[in-house]
UniProtKB/Swiss-Prot annotation:
A matching Pfam family: Transcrip_reg
Disulphide bond pairs: none
Organism in which the protein naturally occurs: Geotalea uraniireducens (strain Rf4) (Geobacter uraniireducens)
Annotated keywords: Cytoplasm, DNA-binding, Transcription, Transcription regulation
Name the UniProt record assigns to this protein: Probable transcriptional regulatory protein Gura_1416
Length: 247
């Protein structure tokens, strides 16, 4: 399994997604609001907004919530001002961790993030300490039922960098700039992804087991549970056998 999807697979197995739907909505509303503020309220001319709306629809967010978030971002409603930044550090076993936040109080957020690192046997580092271990890529995930050869041909012709046949899904990666163009081309050809986003993909993986694996999952859980944290990326790998021991 490719590393960037390890955490989402683990969350699915733990049944954590439904339990945290309220927090997911909060984070998505923030993302829609900021995307609309920075690039305007028309998703056709604002790729970041379009991606955020698609994610929200994928989580069954009501249309009214989406429209209110867009209106808030474009100045139609009063609201707080959010600042975006990324914190970096190391988790248990030296795993690299990137934490993307959107906050109205940087002092509060940096204190919270540092505390989570420390309590989970990790440590927060300086800016740039681990970001070089990740590549920013467009990622589209398709079900295994899709004809791989046809998708491969269409994706490469559309400008994708790679198409990989994973254990549970097919993944198409692109450079961030051409992500929306490749996605639109594939959708017009009849290939609709289950998920599509610009993400951070680790270049190498750190294998964890035992207490280190437990603490790493605790760190990821607590980071995602923080309202100011939008995304968490890490380069850890935990085997199926190790996961079974912890479940």
């Amino acid at each position: 399994m490719s590393g960037h999807n390890k955490w989402s697979t683990i969350k699915h197995k733990k049944g954590a997604a439904d339990a945290k739907r309220g927090k997911i909505f909060t984070k998505l509303i923030k993302e829609i609001t900021v995307a609309a503020k920075l690039g305007g309220g028309d998703p056709e001319g604002n790729p970041r907004l379009r991606t955020a709306i698609d994610k929200a629809k994928g989580e069954n967010m009501p249309k009214d919530n989406i429209e209110r978030a867009i209106k808030k971002g474009t100045g139609g409603m009063d609201g707080v001002v959010y600042e975006e930044t990324t914190y970096e550090g190391y988790g248990p076993g030296g795993a690299a961790v990137l934490v993307e936040v959107m906050t109205d109080n940087r002092n509060r957020t940096v204190s919270d993030v540092r505390s989570i690192f420390t309590k989970c046997n990790g440590n927060m580092g300086e800016s740039g300490c681990v970001s070089w271990m990740f590549d920013k890529k467009g990622l589209m995930v398709f079900p295994k039922s899709v004809d791989f050869d046809k998708l491969f041909e269409a994706a490469i012709e559309a400008g994708a960098e790679d198409v990989s046949d994973e254990e549970e899904q097919i993944e198409v990666t692109t450079d961030p700039v051409s992500f929306m163009e490749v996605r639109d081309t594939l959708e017009k050809a009849g290939f609709k992804p289950e998920s599509a986003e610009v993400t951070m993909i680790p270049q190498t993986m750190v294998k964890l087991e035992g207490k280190q694996a437990e603490n790493m999952l605790k760190l990821m859980d607590r980071m995602e549970d923080n309202d100011d944290v939008q995304n968490v990326y890490a380069n850890f790998d935990i085997s199926e056998e190790e996961m079974d021991k912890m479940m």
